[in-house]
Amino acid sequence: MLQLHPSDIKDIILQGGVIAYPTEAVYGLGCDPDNDTAILKLLAVKQRPWQKGLILVASDFQQLLAYVDESQLTAEQLEFAFSKWPGPFTFVMPIKAQVSKYLCGEFDSIAVRVSAHAGVQALCRALNKPLVSTSANLAGEDPALTAAEILADFTGKIDALVLGELGEQRQPSTIIDARSGKILRNGQ
């Protein structure tokens, strides 16, 4: 498994690679959200059913517009999300018709976050698009908190490990339904 800095990882992701990378709280697994083969590989590595859906993480909201149908949200709903970003808040928003079922699972919505983590922002800026994001662990296990855990659990299963530090968060992000305002998961 290659161990690289965020600026060196773009080609691996765009060629269908699955990576592990530090986020605000834990290591994440990620891939290109426009590559179903890469998404299926990520799901297989994590042993996660596609029906559950995944999160997209971005450096800014503009990167999410290819996936989120903002026309189904009011100005107030969008402003609430914008008031929390960048930061540890994930919003479930309506999807555009062309979004892969492997991203949204069995839902008509997708979970999205604008990250405050410098490494995640650098990855997304280098890609000029969001990154699939899910915690780096097998389904039901605790997420990885160190590069050593990634190397132990995922060597031979993923294509690269992005070097860097975890953020200051110690809890997963809060997940909020953007349409109803309902908190689906309390985090931070």
UniProtKB/Swiss-Prot annotation:
Gene3D superfamilies: DHBP synthase. Residues 3-188 form the YrdC-like domain. It comes from the Bacteria. SUPFAM superfamilies: YrdC/RibB. GO terms for molecular function: ATP binding; double-stranded RNA binding; L-threonylcarbamoyladenylate synthase; tRNA binding. The keyword Chaperone does not apply. Its EC number is 2.7.7.87. GO terms for biological process: regulation of translational fidelity; tRNA threonylcarbamoyladenosine modification. It catalyses: L-threonine + hydrogencarbonate + ATP = L-threonylcarbamoyladenylate + diphosphate + H2O. It is an enzyme of class 2 (transferase). Its main location: cytoplasm. Keywords: ATP-binding, Cytoplasm, Nucleotide-binding, Nucleotidyltransferase, Transferase, tRNA processing. It is found in: Cytoplasm. GO terms for cellular component: cytoplasm. Disulfide bonds: none annotated. It holds the Pfam family Sua5_yciO_yrdC. The keyword Nucleotide-binding applies. Required for the formation of a threonylcarbamoyl group on adenosine at position 37 (t(6)A37) in tRNAs that read codons beginning with adenine. Catalyzes the conversion of L-threonine, HCO(3)(-)/CO(2) and ATP to give threonylcarbamoyl-AMP (TC-AMP) as the acyladenylate intermediate, with the release of diphosphate. Belongs to the SUA5 family. TsaC subfamily. This is Threonylcarbamoyl-AMP synthase.
